[in-house]
Amino acid sequence: MQDEFKTDTPRTEAGSEKETMPSMEELLKAAELAAAEHHDAWLRAKAETENMRRRAAEDVDKARKFAVESFAGELLAVKDSLEAALAAESPSVDNLKDGVTLTLKQLSAVFGKFNLHDIEPLGEKFDPHLHQAIQVVESEQPANTVVTVLQKGYRLHDRTLRPALVMVAKGKD
């Protein structure tokens, strides 16, 4: 019967398993350390995201504020020309007209450089995206054809900045 109660070998095996298996306190400490590392990484990622959002907002504000900076710089030469014309002691009408013509060419060149183009609708079919009809008139032209331009329109790239004010032909009755 004493042989049945000998359990030295299993106790030794269980004892050796106890030595290799970490205790609950060690597992808890390891889990707490991992959780602290993950929390710290999350806080850093959150701070980085907030910094990126703030920098992006600042970049948008700067872009909005200085979007016309180069356009404005180009217009300074036009302003200088107009001021020089006004400063002339006794400009003749021809000289003044030549100066205004050159200034208009300068201004048109600046507009072209920045993709600001005239809308020239005379003789074209009325387009409500590009034209604003002020009046419908009797004309020999086909119906809905622009017959008179009262004020030029302008496009910036593909967007209408200001529609052309036009008179449109009425359909023949």
Curated annotation (Swiss-Prot):
What GO molecular function annotation could you give as one example from this UniProt entry? protein-folding chaperone binding
Key words, A-Z = Chaperone, Cytoplasm, Stress response
Which stretches does the entry tag as region Disordered? Answer: 1-23
Composition-biased stretches, type Basic and acidic residues, lie in 1-20
Keyword Ligase listed = no
Gene Ontology terms: cellular component: cytosol
Task: Please give the biological process terms from Gene Ontology that the record holds.
Answer: protein folding
Main subcellular location: cytoplasm
Q: Which Gene3D superfamilies match?
A: 3.90.20.20, Head domain of nucleotide exchange factor GrpE (2.30.22.10)
Localization annotation: Cytoplasm
User: Which Pfam families is this protein grouped with?
Assistant: GrpE
Name the family the entry cites: Belongs to the GrpE family.
Instruction: Note the subunit structure.
Output: Homodimer.
Q: What does this protein do?
A: Participates actively in the response to hyperosmotic and heat shock by preventing the aggregation of stress-denatured proteins, in association with DnaK and GrpE. It is the nucleotide exchange factor for DnaK and may function as a thermosensor. Unfolded proteins bind initially to DnaJ; upon interaction with the DnaJ-bound protein, DnaK hydrolyzes its bound ATP, resulting in the formation of a stable complex. GrpE releases ADP from DnaK; ATP binding to DnaK triggers the release of the substrate protein, thus completing the reaction cycle.
Please give the name of this protein. Protein GrpE
